[in-house]
Regions:
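Canonical tetratricopeptide repeat
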Residues: 4, 38, 72-76
Length: 81
């Protein structure tokens, strides 16, 4: 639920609040690829590009990351958001 709320806030451009919720979600689910991807997105939109790339790279290393998400993450690592 925390991730979902954070993602809603992200999509309505409330990036700082989104980052806070997504950070909390990451603490609850540290190996969830979607949560870490969303947190990376929020970091990027808050001007923390280096940290965002760290989390996106981490998503690529998780065993349960699906191929479609890996492709999206690789694009983000090249182009950003």
């Amino acid at each position: 639920i925390t991730d979902s709320l954070g993602w809603v806030l992200f999509n309505i451009k409330r990036y700082q609040e989104a980052k806070d919720y997504l950070q909390s979600a990451g603490k609850l689910m540290p190996s969830d690829p979607i949560v870490n991807d969303h947190y990376g997105d929020a970091l990027w939109k808050n001007g923390n590009q280096i940290q965002a790339r760290y989390y996106w790279d981490y998503v690529l290393k998780l065993d349960k990351t699906e191929d479609d998400l890996k492709k999206i993450i690789k694009e983000k690592l090249i182009k950003g958001l």
